């Protein structure tokens, strides 16, 4: 890919942005074929592996000649009745996939060059791969905020809208017509028919191009909104004249800022906002969380402007229900499988002076992450480890496994739950999860050996989860310790994948966001 990027002459991309000639280079389709082969080897059966014998540079030259003969479209393989005569002796799916991969390589190379300047400005941000790395940031910043905007990115858009956004950095008309043809022929790349998947791409059609389109869609949102938030956050305060009452002056000066910009007639206009020096933003897939410190009027203005942003920039209909407002002091919110709330804590402080001493009780805000016990029980019930009320049941399907395999499976499920929810401030729910998993493990072993649960416990011991390493046992003891110094939240730096429960919970929440009008 780097060699192709060097041979493509980056200066030509920056000055002219002509992409269509790249579609006639043989090296491009060699790269595309390599991507297609690696993906097909993972997801397709061995019957379709005969594509190895079909690829040759002679085939590529024939494909390029077919592309040259196309009128207004590179890809017209969607209608088999119109193209079966053209593709005699060749697999039309192979041609279609190869052209799609080739177009994706061109877009990825050009997009990486175009976004280099934007990405250079983000190098100063600390980047961590672990999912838990975002929680210390939220723990440090969100308690200083008053309101939270919970935003769901609109999950579908018209193909022509994406073509219009690509016109900002693709200037040659043939490339735009080619992209328009691909998006209209393969609408399943951008329109999800599955209501459980409220994102830009359908789960069964996750191609390299569909992932690129989703990332570009999110990039467009962030590249326009993040600079606006930075400008608003770093804005200067307004200098007032003399006020009769200095207390009122300081209260007003703290919450008011001014923006100055030139209009079409080069006239300066002043737009007044309530100042918000605390704007924090996190994202997970199709979901944005924006924490604000200010009044309810300010938050309503932000929701109004964000709704207009999607309506004007992406030509989507107004969807204010996708942006909910939560007051952090009264409501809790969910994110990445956790339930979060901001609790008001009071503590007694004794201040001793030379001649006197007094006691005060200051109020502080504490970030409180909680493992959702009820929803975890619902997930375990769905996996048939217990019923909906939390009563454990055995896994009869596992009775054909060995004892070590059964113990290992239950132990792995328990360790995954404990590892992911080690940052929970309340461990009672994790105690219950451990009990729910221990009893099904004993019931499964008892059913396999046709004995009682008491006999199984006497044979394997009261602690059925015996596969944990010494370090993991030490971590478990620290997580459930009763001393205050050892009850601190533990965030791990090695969690690279979401807990399966998070995905099921996210799908359930997305279904609740949907309205009959969308369906």
From Swiss-Prot:
It is found in: Plastid, Chloroplast. It holds the Pfam family MatK_N. GO terms for biological process: mRNA processing; RNA splicing; tRNA processing. InterPro entries: Domain_X, Maturase_MatK, Maturase_MatK_N. Keywords: Chloroplast, mRNA processing, Plastid, RNA-binding, tRNA processing. The keyword tRNA processing applies. GO terms for cellular component: chloroplast. GO terms for molecular function: RNA binding. Belongs to the intron maturase 2 family. MatK subfamily. HAMAP family: MatK (MF_01390). Usually encoded in the trnK tRNA gene intron. Probably assists in splicing its own and other chloroplast group II introns. This is Maturase K. The lineage of its organism: Eukaryota, Viridiplantae, Streptophyta, Embryophyta, Tracheophyta. The gene is matK.
